[in-house]
């Protein structure tokens, strides 16, 4: 027997049933996708789909060459024809904005876009963190005021309500100011951290040289006292940045959205400015962040487009659905409405016709394949989770009737004329 080929570690199959190490099912995932489709339409966002492979330069320019994502986590390879460096996308914003610039979507109006799809990072797999993971992203492009900042926060809070997890999530916010303000803060931060360089761990020493703001994001408990006393970016904000942040907070207050100001919240990608935020939870162990985002007013220009102030956020679907499966509520119904079975010569063709007629009327019908006893077929109908069973045997064929059974017992088992099949099932379903 040939050796089985296993999936790549950290890249999961999505099956109709739960797996030992991956509890999410395809039906649960589909129910979430349906919820997201309704949610995004309610806020006027339109879907965009981009390739999973992009030129590596896109992420170097947008995310930042010195970031952990670009430096250590991307899957990068050369195209065999022209040696062009390509990468599997590690996040969705850069690809979305590349498409917007390439196709001139901001030519005459702002855009509200959303995406959903797989992303890839070469990380150590653990619960809620995988090498292939999926994101839902929201991008509001061409909007300058703090009102859109507050709107997308409210939008995300609305989704948490729909998923039944609002009480388990905490909103943290911060302002990173503009480029000049961050530069002034960076200089002060480097001067401060350099005094403690001998106490920094190796990762923080590296970040001190490449992206000192990320030192403040360390999870090392031995460095918390040093980081807590570090210069705060909020103290370097100018009047315009302060006003934007103050108006943003006032809008959150007006919407009744509670938040915590976290001056050490910086996000892991270089393109952020002004408003940044994260939704966190204490229910997933170390993987606390479920959703994060912020403003990236200079990114579209950085990618070759005309300047356009913008904001967005992304959520990791696997991590989010782990939270929903444990604490939330998501209506999942993968079972068919009807299980159609047959017994005897020519009954298989007739039940196929009945099943197709029911499907045209909106019923989900699973048709039995093969030839087994009615007892065996009824067992499969029960295992399928179908609410109703449709039986066509020799007596029904001869009399022009069908037998219907309510698997929940409410209507029992009845024989009805074939022409009344759809009407009867509709009555039972709506009762």
Curated annotation (Swiss-Prot):
UniProt-recorded Gene Ontology molecular function terms: ATP binding; histidine-tRNA ligase activity
Major localization listed first in the record, in broad terms: cytoplasm
One cellular component (GO) term of this entry: cytoplasm
Gene Ontology terms describing biological process: histidyl-tRNA aminoacylation
Top-rank lineage group of the source organism: Bacteria
Keywords linked to the UniProt accession: Aminoacyl-tRNA synthetase, ATP-binding, Cytoplasm, Ligase, Nucleotide-binding, Protein biosynthesis
Pfam families: HGTP_anticodon (PF03129), tRNA-synt_His (PF13393)
Name of the top EC class for this enzyme: ligase
Subcellular location: Cytoplasm
Aminoacyl-tRNA synthetase listed as a keyword: yes
Coiled coil: none
Gene3D superfamilies referenced in this protein's UniProt entry, alphabetically: Anticodon-binding domain, Bira Bifunctional Protein, Domain 2
CDD domains xref list: HisRS-like_core, HisRS_anticodon
Family statement drawn from the similarity comment of this UniProt entry: Belongs to the class-II aminoacyl-tRNA synthetase family.
Quaternary context: Homodimer.
NCBIfam families xrefs: hisS (TIGR00442)
The protein's name: Histidine--tRNA ligase
């Amino acid at each position: 027997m040939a050796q089985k080929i296993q999936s790549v570690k950290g890249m999961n199959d999505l099956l109709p049933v739960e797996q030992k190490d991956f509890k999410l099912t395809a039906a649960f995932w589909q129910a979430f996708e349906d919820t997201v489709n309704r949610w995004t339409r309610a806020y006027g966002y339109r879907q965009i789909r981009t390739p999973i492979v992009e030129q590596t330069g896109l992420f170097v320019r947008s995310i930042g060459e010195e970031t952990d994502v670009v430096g250590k986590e991307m899957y990068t390879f050369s195209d065999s024809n022209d040696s062009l460096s390509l990468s599997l996308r590690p996040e969705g914003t850069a690809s979305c904005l590349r498409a917007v610039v390439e196709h001139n979507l901001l030519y005459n109006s702002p855009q509200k876009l959303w995406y959903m799809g797989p992303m890839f990072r070469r990380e150590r797999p653990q619960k809620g963190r995988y090498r292939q993971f999926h994101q839902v992203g929201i991008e509001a492009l061409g909007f300058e005021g703090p009102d859109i900042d507050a709107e997308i926060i409210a939008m995300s809070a609305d989704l948490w309500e729909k998923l039944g997890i609002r009480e388990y999530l905490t909103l943290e916010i911060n302002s990173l100011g503009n480029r000049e303000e961050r530069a002034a803060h960076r200089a002060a931060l480097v001067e401060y951290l350099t005094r403690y360089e001998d106490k920094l761990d190796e990762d923080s020493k590296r970040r001190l040289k490449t992206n000192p703001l990320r030192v403040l994001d360390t999870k090392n408990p031995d460095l918390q006292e040093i980081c807590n006393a570090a210069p705060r970016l909020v103290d370097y904000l100018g009047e315009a940045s302060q006003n934007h942040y103050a108006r943003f907070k006032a809008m959150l207050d007006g919407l009744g959205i509670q938040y915590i100001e976290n001056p050490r919240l910086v996000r892991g990608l270089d393109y952020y400015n002004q408003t940044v935020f994260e939704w966190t939870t204490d229910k997933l162990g170390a993987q606390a962040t479920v959703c994060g985002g912020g403003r990236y007013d200079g990114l579209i220009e950085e990618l070759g487009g005309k300047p356009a102030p913008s904001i967005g956020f992304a959520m990791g679907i696997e991590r989010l659905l782990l939270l929903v499966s444990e604490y939330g509520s998501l209506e999942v119904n993968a079972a068919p409405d009807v299980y159609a079975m047959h017994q005897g010569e020519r009954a298989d063709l007739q039940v196929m016709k009945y099943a197709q007629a029911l499907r045209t009327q909106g019923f989900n019908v699973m048709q039995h394949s093969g030839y087994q006893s009615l007892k065996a077929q009824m067992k499969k109908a029960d295992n399928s989770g179908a609410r109703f069973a449709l039986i066509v045997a020799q007596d029904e064929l001869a009399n022009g009737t069908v037998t219907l059974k309510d698997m929940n017992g409410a209507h029992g088992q009845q024989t009805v004329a074939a022409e009344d099949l759809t009407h009867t099932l509709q009555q039972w379903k709506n009762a």
